[in-house]
A protein has these predicted regions:
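Alpha-helical transmembrane segments of multipass membrane proteins
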Residues: 25, 29-33, 97-105, 145, ...
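Helix-loop-helix units of permease transmembrane domains in multi-pass membrane transporters
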Residues: 69-95
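Terminal transmembrane helical anchor/hairpin motif
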Residues: 40-41, 107-137, 162-240
């Protein structure tokens, strides 16, 4: 475990300054909402909410999965840290980072009860604000996005120029293609996809269950992790 601890510490020191900047950005966003929300909503209505305070954190965690991967990869290899050890250490680092951000988001939720009537995606989706559910769901969402960022970076690094262009263009091409397929099936395609997503996130029953969504996101994160490992073990050092 000592070999993992040293690599995690290496990553943690790297993330610390980025983490500080990100927390400052989220804090500034919340302070701004604290001023704007009372100005544009009826103070007499305690149930009115505007915006989601965890969007900045979600985007940042998605980016950090890609940022941490190239940082120090060649340096750690040079100092005898194997790719397998780096993979495990990175997984543990992202898990710890996701847990920390879940707690930070919960702290902002508590502060917003006093300063601004805002909410987070968990509250908007499940219409509840329990501490355990919020932290667990946010942790799973952060972890999934971190692995998505990590996977995306590695795929772009190991593919050629034409493949990179195709991957970048794919999201813009996918929309029209899905639209045509949906028209061909009289809307059945998107309805089926929508039902699958709703069920996977635990929203299909009369009482939404966030822990179904947590399980789905964790399983998906594990799937990305399983896809990441063989890529990381084979990626060329000169590309890092």
């Amino acid at each position: 475990m000592g070999r993992y601890a040293s690599v995690i510490k290496f990553y943690a020191l790297t993330v610390l300054k980025w983490q500080t900047v990100s927390i400052a950005a989220v804090l500034a966003f919340n302070v701004l909402l604290s001023v704007l929300v009372p100005a544009f909503t009826s103070i007499s209505d305690p149930h009115v909410t505007i915006g989601s305070t965890d969007v900045v954190a979600l985007v940042w965690v998605l980016a950090i999965g890609a940022i941490l991967t190239p940082y120090g990869f060649r340096f750690l290899l040079y100092h005898g840290v194997s790719r397998s050890t780096q993979f495990t250490a990175m997984c543990l680092t992202l898990a710890a980072l996701s847990a920390a951000w879940a707690v930070i988001v919960m702290a902002f939720i508590s502060a917003n009860l006093v300063f601004a009537r805002t909410s987070v995606l968990y509250q908007l989706l499940y219409n509840r604000a329990d501490v355990l559910g919020t932290i667990t769901w946010e942790f799973a969402a952060f972890l999934l996005l971190a692995f998505v960022g990590w996977f995306t970076y590695l795929v772009l690094r190991v593919t050629g120029r034409n493949a990179k262009i195709a991957l970048i263009a794919a999201p813009f091409m996918l929309g029209p293609i899905l639209g045509l397929l949906n028209m061909a099936t009289d809307g059945a395609l998107l309805r089926a996809v929508g039902r699958a997503v709703v069920a996977a996130m635990g929203l299909s029953s009369s009482v939404p269950n966030p822990y179904v969504g947590v399980l789905s996101m964790l399983v998906l994160a594990l799937a990305f992790g399983a896809a990441i490992r063989p890529i990381l073990l084979r990626v060329q050092v000169r590309e890092s």
